[in-house]
């Protein structure tokens, strides 16, 4: 999958898809917004935010 710009609800939806039942921590302070919204991120990078 190509890198994507993911912001707000799109970012949360992508985390649900990637993490599934594991759940995830959505903390803007963790740099996920910086990484995925201001720049682009891959699904592989999103997995770093799963629990």
Swiss-Prot record:
> One Pfam family from the UniProt entry?
Insulin
State the UniProt keywords alphabetically: Carbohydrate metabolism, Disulfide bond, Glucose metabolism, Hormone, Secreted
Question: Which PROSITE patterns does the protein's record reference?
Answer: INSULIN
Tell me where the signal peptide lies: none
The protein's predominant localisation is secreted
Q: Where in the cell is it found?
A: Secreted
Disulfide bonds listed in the record: 7-37, 19-50, 36-41
User: Which GO BP terms apply?
Assistant: glucose metabolic process
Q: Which GO molecular function annotation, any one, does this entry have?
A: hormone activity
- Give the SMART domains listed for this entry: IlGF (SM00078)
Record Gene3D superfamilies: Insulin-like
What's this chain's function? Insulin decreases blood glucose concentration. It increases cell permeability to monosaccharides, amino acids and fatty acids. It accelerates glycolysis, the pentose phosphate cycle, and glycogen synthesis in liver.
Q: Which family does it belong to?
A: Belongs to the insulin family.
Quaternary structure and partners: Heterodimer of a B chain and an A chain linked by two disulfide bonds.
What's the name of the protein? Insulin
The organism named in the record is Meleagris gallopavo (Wild turkey)
